[in-house]
């Protein structure tokens, strides 16, 4: 039983490695039309759920930390703290998790259905490589859209924090915005975008 599990793990790792290698080999023959279709399907259609998730994440985080910072007289750091936390960590991670759930499930269901209905076998019969036709456009679309969506999510999260800090906690809008300029740097956001592309 243990040996069978080990064999199963090795078999899956080998299959995954082979799929990655085949995908890399097929990257030089990208169908741009399919890539744009997948960018719209996987990226643009994910905007509503990313907006809700990051908006409430930024709002709740600001709600939690503002009282503590006000207690210590550090309310002028709220915006900067939110920008750094969202740009470096929370934004890319939350966007990655949301897309893994939504996009991963959608791709799995779509390709699984094609496998069951023998559409993938039909592609092979027509001398069309299923990896190049199905996998590569989705991989390229994700590589392009995830950093864009991560940046969008960071902006939405900071906006959610801005609303809570100014409308609920009574901070001056200029205090929040000046704090962002003072404590955050471009590298905070570029680092987050690099992380999101890896996700």
Residue ranges and their predicted role:
Residues 50, 144-158:
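Hydrophobic alpha-helical membrane-insertion segments
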Residues 129-150:
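Start (N-cap) of specific transmembrane helices in multi-pass transporter permeases
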Residues 111-136:
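Short cytoplasmic-facing helical segments at TM-TM junctions of multi-pass membrane proteins
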Residues 26-44:
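Cytosolic juxtamembrane amphipathic/interface segments immediately preceding
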Residues 38, 42-94, 98:
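Active-site cofactor/substrate anionic-group-binding motifs, chiefly glycine-
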